Amino acid sequence: MRKITHGNPIEIDTDDASARQIANQLRKLFPVYSVQELSPDDSIRRELVMIKVRAANSEDRNEVIQIANIFRASIIDVSLNSLTIAIIGAESKVDAIQKLLQGFGILEMVRTGMVALERGGSTINDNNKEKGEFNYGKLL
């Protein structure tokens, strides 16, 4: 499984040659400035999710708040019949809280998909300068 990141990552299950071809095609898209493959070991990956959950009574509301606290999520909106939770974390963490909240009734949910940065002090621009990689005829 390969992850190619250009803003939002694209997950593909392919060989190295096909992954390089896809990366080359992505570099031609506007406004892609840079493409870099990141391995799970060499990157920090997170996903942002907002979940609007039905919480029509105080008992449900308290349980939803407790679940949010356990996962270090934030309550970002409150109404008479619902709570909206924001959580940032690994895909497994997001999946786990989603599963727990389904019993209350998920009214709406949005997920960014996985975003990633390389670990350490180097940046994608540093790596591209070392490779002499060009986009739009300009060295990045």
Locate predicted features.
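Long, contiguous binding/interaction regions
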Residues: 1-7, 11-140
